[in-house]
Amino acid sequence: MALKKYNPTTPGQRQLVLVDRSALYKGKPVKSLTEGKISNGGRNNTGRITVRFRGGGHKQTYRIVDFKRTKVDVPAKVERLEYDPNRTAFIALIKYEDGEQAYILAPQRLSVGDSVIAGSYVDVKPGNVMPLGNMPVGTIVHNIELKIGKGGQIARSAGTYAQLVGRDHDYVIVRLNSGEQRLVHGRCTATIGAVSNPDHMNISIGKAGRKRWLGRRPHNRGVVMNPIDHPHGGGEGRTSGGRHPVTPWGKPTKGKKTRSNKSTDKFILISRHKRKKK
């Protein structure tokens, strides 16, 4: 879908660039595939802020998206493509031959009326699901499982994808958008194709109020706060902080490595950080 620019009738309109969603379904979502969503404004169950700069925004309904695709060898037809306020990608409503409906992530080049299917050996076309071990090398995939049967976790945002670049016994080698190459078990499934809405990265919000509609509050730097609020706070006049950048809780930021998941390090063949050094 193309980008949509607006005439500069106001300062906010002048900068505004959005994705043209005119081809999407304009009605309400399927009620049986939705849930209520409570806005917590970044607070946890004790009322304390656990995520800063969140709050407000338009009320949203959560769409239950099927990331597992466990209905095997049952063809489904794409009924319509829809907007989903909970994610950057578009979603597709599919209807199986037995009448069951489900939402899936819409891949690029998937149209209304297309047929999709999940199985061990299916056609390599957008929207179909099969185990990574059965796919030909070079296939573009998204919604990749990391644990067998858990459902897709990798490459789910708008425009993202990964590429199957090799095999290693029971595992396959997958190259991610970040440049990282990692091993994934061959029995883990993935959906063929790249995720829809690749133009999402090119949108321009246009004004602060549009961020508020999305539930994002103003973000304040540490150096403009008081010492009680941030390690960089305080000082007479404008100061640079006087120490290496840290989080509000004193942990080093801006480049310090924080990954400590040693149990899965063996699955990462090429780190995304190594790619940047070349």
From Swiss-Prot:
Entries under SMART domains matching the protein: Ribosomal_L2, Ribosomal_L2_C
Repeat in keyword set: no
GO CC entries: large ribosomal subunit
Annotated stretches, region: Disordered: 222-278
Molecular-function GO terms, alphabetical: rRNA binding; structural constituent of ribosome; transferase activity
Record InterPro entries: NA-bd_OB-fold, Rib_uL2_dom2, Ribosomal_uL2, Ribosomal_uL2_bac/org-type, Ribosomal_uL2_C, Ribosomal_uL2_CS, Ribosomal_uL2_dom3, Ribosomal_uL2_RNA-bd_dom
A GO biological-process term: cytoplasmic translation
Keywords noted in UniProt: Ribonucleoprotein, Ribosomal protein, RNA-binding, rRNA-binding
Family, as annotated: Belongs to the universal ribosomal protein uL2 family.
Function: One of the primary rRNA binding proteins. Required for association of the 30S and 50S subunits to form the 70S ribosome, for tRNA binding and peptide bond formation. It has been suggested to have peptidyltransferase activity; this is somewhat controversial. Makes several contacts with the 16S rRNA in the 70S ribosome.
NCBIfam families the UniProt entry points to: rplB_bact (TIGR01171)
Protein name: Large ribosomal subunit protein uL2
Organism the protein comes from: Rhodopseudomonas palustris (strain BisB5)
